[in-house]
């Protein structure tokens, strides 16, 4: 049995399509089929039920799939460990980040790639739940986001800074002079709302579970930078974390005046998992970055 065969098996099991799996693996379909057949012969069992219309896993295939995934992940961990023992910062680093955290990441990405050019960064922007699922499957080395409201026992969170859910307006907006804001304050104003699934929207729905139908929602978007551009150039307001506009010209953040309005910026890792030296170095640089230090300072001095 070879790791390559397990890799081919896993991709075919995920797609249930030999042609699609072969394309994803950059091999010919005949090569893929040959390796799968060889694996079945070595294990003396069929892993797939094939006919002219479909491909399905057999019971043996279903049993093998999670074990094969774990074996492939462990093989990657072995390589990372050996490289770390040689004190090499190389290989790849898979980072998950929610859309709201984008402004916080940029400074560290630039500094890290200059300091460690042998490390390839793979950065995935997705919703919180998608990222937590990828982290639990060990498809990511760590995730940057606010602390989720749901419980993930397999994941541990390391605090970077505290923040508040805020109303974001342009600096000429009638609300821009306020130090705190209430739900009643925003009801007369048109709103560009973050879409469901974004952490700011999740936090707002938690703080004000019945408010949405009272509000003048003109649009919903799942792209934070576009939301900010719309607010900067119009009379619309939006609702995001205060951290999003730190050192951004033309916009003002007014925190909601409501109990429990705390959004905790975190690095999330798999509990008990081996952490690459490259990941440790990236997180160290992130913690020391101006973007994080200033947010942490502002949180302590509110």
Task: Tell what function each PLM region has.
Residues 189-211, 275-283, 289-300:
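Secondary-structure junction motif
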Residues 10-28:
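Short helix-boundary/capping micro-motifs
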Residues 29-30, 34, 80, 86-116, ...:
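N-terminal winged-helix
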Residues 87, 154-165, 169-191, 275-276:
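Flexible hinge/capping segments at coil-to-helix
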Residues 152-158, 163, 225-272:
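Beta-alpha-beta core module
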Residues 42-43, 64-86:
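Alpha-helical linker/hinge and terminal dimerization helices associated
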Residues 40-59:
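A short LG(V/I)-centered, amphipathic sequence patch enriched
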């Amino acid at each position: 049995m070879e790791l390559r065969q397990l890799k081919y098996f896993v991709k075919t099991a995920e797609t249930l399509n030999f042609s699609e799996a072969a394309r994803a693996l950059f091999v010919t379909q005949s090569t893929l089929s040959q390796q799968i057949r060889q694996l079945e012969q070595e294990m003396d069992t069929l892993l797939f039920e094939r006919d002219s219309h479909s491909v399905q896993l057999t019971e043996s295939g279903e049993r093998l799939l999670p074990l094969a995934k774990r074996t492939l992940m462990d093989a990657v961990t072995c390589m990372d460990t050996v490289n770390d023992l040689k004190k090499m910062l190389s290989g790849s680093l898979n980072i998950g980040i929610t859309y709201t955290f984008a402004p916080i990441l940029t400074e560290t990405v630039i500094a890290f790639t200059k300091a460690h050019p042998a490390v390839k960064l793979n950065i995935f922007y997705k919703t919180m739940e998608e990222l937590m699922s990828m982290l639990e499957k060990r498809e990511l080395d760590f995730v940057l986001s606010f602390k989720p409201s749901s419980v993930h026992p397999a994941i541990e969170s390391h605090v970077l800074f505290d923040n508040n859910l805020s109303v974001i307006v342009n600096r000429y907006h009638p609300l821009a002079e306020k130090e705190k804001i209430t739900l009643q304050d925003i009801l007369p104003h048109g709103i560009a709302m973050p879409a469901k699934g974004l952490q700011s929207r999740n936090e707002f729905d938690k703080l004000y579970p019945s408010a949405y139908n009272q509000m003048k929602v003109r649009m919903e978007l799942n792209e934070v930078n576009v939301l900010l551009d719309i607010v900067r150039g119009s009379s619309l307001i939006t609702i995001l974390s205060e951290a999003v506009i730190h050192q951004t010209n033309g916009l003002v953040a007014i925190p909601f005046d409501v109990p429990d309005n705390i959004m905790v910026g975190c690095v999330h890792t798999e509990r008990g998992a081996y952490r690459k030296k490259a990941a440790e170095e990236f997180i160290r640089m992130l913690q020391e970055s101006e973007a994080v230090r200033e947010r942490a300072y502002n949180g302590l001095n509110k």
